[in-house]
Amino acid sequence: MFPDHLSDLFSIPQLFGYVAFAFGVGCFLQKSDLRFKIYMAIECVAYVVHFWLLGVPTAAASSAVSLGRSLASIRSRSPWVAAFFIGLAIVMGVWLYKGPLSLLPIMASCIGTTALFFFSGIRMRLLMLVGTGLWVVNNILSGSYGGTALELVILTTNCWTIWRLRRDSVSTLT
C-alpha cells in the first residue's frame, strides 16, 4: 500500500485519485440528493482514469458503471434502469474477474445502484456507507492512496451529513 518512492505519491494515476478525493468529499457533504449525484458523477470520471492507470480494470469498470448510473439516477427511479446497471456491473465483474479482490468494486456498485435508485435522504446515505466500506478494503488492497484516503474521509463525511440530515428532520418536527 505504501509507495516505494515519494514520487509515486505524485504520479499521474495518484493525481486522478486526488481529484476523485476532492469531488468525493464534496459529494458526501451535499444535503441535496441532486447535487450529491452530480458530484458523484464527476468523482466517478476521475476514478475511472485513476484505476485504469493503476491497472485495476474491475475497479475502473465499476467506476464507469457508477458514472452511468449516477447520471441515470438523476432522471430516473425506474427499477428497470436500476436492474440494467446492476446487471451491467455483474457482467463486467465476471468478464474482468481476476480473483476475490475483483468482487469488492462490483458489490459496491450494486449496493450504490440500489441506494441511488430506490432510496433518498438518510436511507440512501446509509446504504452508500456499506458500499464505502467495500471501497475502503478494495483501495487498500489495490494500492490506491488517494482512493483509500477518499473513502475514509467519505465514511466520516457521510456519517456527519447523516447526522445533519437527522438533526434537521428532528428540528422541523419540534
Show where each model-derived region lies.
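Alpha-helical membrane-protein topology signature
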Residues: M1-T174
